[in-house]
Structures are given as C-alpha cells and as structure tokens.
Amino acid sequence: MALPIIIDCDPGHDDAIALVLSLASPELEVKAITSSAGNQTPEKTLRNVLRMLTLLKRPDIPVAGGAVKPLMRELIIADNVHGESGLDGPALPEPSFAPQSGTAVELMAKTLRESSQPVTIVSTGPQTNVALLLNSHPELHTKIARIVIMGGAMGLGNWTPAAEFNIYVDPEAAEIVFQSGIPVVMAGLDVTHKAQIHAADIERFRAIGNPISTIVAELLDFFMEYHKDEKWGFVGAPLHDPCTIAWLLKPEIFTTVERWVGVETQGKYTQGMTVVDYYFLTGNKPNATVMVDVDRQGFVDLLAERLQYYA
C-alpha cells in the first residue's frame, strides 16, 4: 500500500525536483501539496507548484497556498539562488488549473481528517504552515505519522555562519515542529551538501531524453551556476530537498542518528541554528532522526531511475 504524504514546499529548483521524484514513485501517494514562502514570495511559490503539476499532468492533486510571512518575523527570500521566478532556467507551462480556495492549513487538516491511516508530512521550505497546523489542530497530531523536513545543520549554516536558510526564515515555527512530540526526520546540510549533482549527472539525466528529464537537467543547469562560487568548495550542486523523498523511498542509502534537536530563536549570532545534542549532553530524549550521510551514487541512481518513469 502506498505511503500517504502531504508535501509543503517553496519551489525552488530543488523543491521542484522533489515533486518530480515523489510523483514518479508508486510507493508514495501524494494527497495534497501546499506552498510556503521562502525561496521566493508566496505568490510565486504557489504559482510554481501549479506550473510543476501542470508539467507533470497532475491537476488532480489538491493545492493550497500557505502563510504569506513567518510567524513572528518579516519574510526573507532566496531570489539570489532561485532567480526572479523562483524556477529560473527552463520554459515551464503556465498553470492549467487553480489552487483550492482555502488555506494550506485547512487543506492539510482536511487531508489528515479524511485519511484512513496516518499521513507523513514532507516539508521542504520554512516550517510556518506545519507549525500553524500543529498549533491550530492538536486533535490531528495522532493522524501525522512523521514530519520529514529539509532544514538545519549540525555543522555550518548556509545563510548565516550558524543557520540553514529554511530554519532561519522562521525559527519559531521550526522550534514548534521539533518540540511537537511528533517524530521528526531532519535532512540538514550535513547530508544535503553530500547529495551533490555533478555536471556528468546532469548530462545523464538529459540523455534520458523525455520532456521531464530534460526540464530537470535545465533546472540543474541554472541551479549549478549559484553553487560554482569557490567559497562553497562544491564539485556540483547540493540537491537539498529531494533528500526528504529519497529517504522515504530508500532509507538504506542514508546514515542517520537519533538525537534531540532544538532551534535557537534568540541568539545574537546563532538565530535559526539547529542545536543537535550529538553527545547527549542535555539529558533530553531524542526527538529527531538526523541524517548525517548519504551514498551519493545511490542517490543519483535513484533520481535517474525515477526520471525514466516519465518516458
């Protein structure tokens, strides 16, 4: 039986590729997709969800737009990474269908209520929508199997020296998610910076030769440019968000540890930092499964295999 999931995302090149991967995987049943503000403004990320689902011929999936700003802060976006549209690079279709009239939280709550089994929430942007869901619907917590997030880092940040972008945008929301008592799986920079796509991998995807693999290659062509900056020391481009979906499909290609994680919401230098109690110093019980390593080749092979689904 396929695993029911809700995807909350802010497309974003890597979010878009996570959508492609999830919808090429019969093991997963994508019951709803909600958009968050982050990589671009809320209007643009919602439009990008609709454009991707139009491309993938999946207008049957309910879509709703989410919070327009973080819980307690002004919105910051990553247009320097993802371009003016949020998905610069390939020519994507205009949306062929409209989102639902309700909010992301309403769609998530309805989906959870109507599901006969607990649903996994995959969140690849800031945690605002998920935190709002948890706070406004405590009665639905038991309907959530787990929350798989792309966010955080045990080590270095990518937006500040201490903080990863998704968590930095809305640290209060992320703290609500981590302390919710619901199992959390964290794909942070420790693993996503190892899930790099190299130039040869992009050509491998392009050579698959179907319309979707071609678009994915073009998304990666654009995404690669930002990551060529020497300061990162990357060979390729880290494919952050697809790690969440890949973990659901093939957990064996990832190495994980069970640890307590908290989010710094006050720090002068460390706002948005995910504090991972790696050495069990706090006495707090683990609240997260933290990804720390990935078999890069296995990750690339999984993407290549699933891109053939669209032939």
From Swiss-Prot:
The active site annotation covers 240
What EC number(s) does the entry state?
3.2.-.-
Q: Which domain of life is it from?
A: Bacteria
GO terms (BP aspect): nucleobase-containing small molecule interconversion; purine nucleoside catabolic process; pyrimidine nucleobase metabolic process
Looking at its record, which EC class is this enzyme?
A: hydrolase
Classification via CDD domains? nuc_hydro_IU_UC_XIUA
Q: Which cellular component appears as one GO term in the record? A: cytosol
Matching Pfam families: IU_nuc_hydro
Q: Which UniProt keywords apply?
A: Glycosidase, Hydrolase
Please give one Gene Ontology molecular function term for this protein. uridine nucleosidase activity
InterPro entries reported in the protein's UniProt record: I/U_nuclsd_hydro_CS (IPR015910), Inosine/uridine_hydrolase_dom (IPR001910), IUNH (IPR023186), Pyrim_hydro_RihA (IPR022975), Ribo_hydro-like (IPR036452)
Q: Does the keyword Hydrolase apply?
A: yes
Give the matching HAMAP family. Answer: Pyrim_hydro_RihA
Task: Please state which protein family the record places this protein in.
Answer: Belongs to the IUNH family. RihA subfamily.
Q: What does this protein do?
A: Hydrolyzes cytidine or uridine to ribose and cytosine or uracil, respectively.
Q: What is this protein called?
A: Pyrimidine-specific ribonucleoside hydrolase RihA
Q: What is the lineage of its organism?
A: Bacteria, Pseudomonadati, Pseudomonadota, Gammaproteobacteria, Enterobacterales
Gene that encodes the chain:
rihA
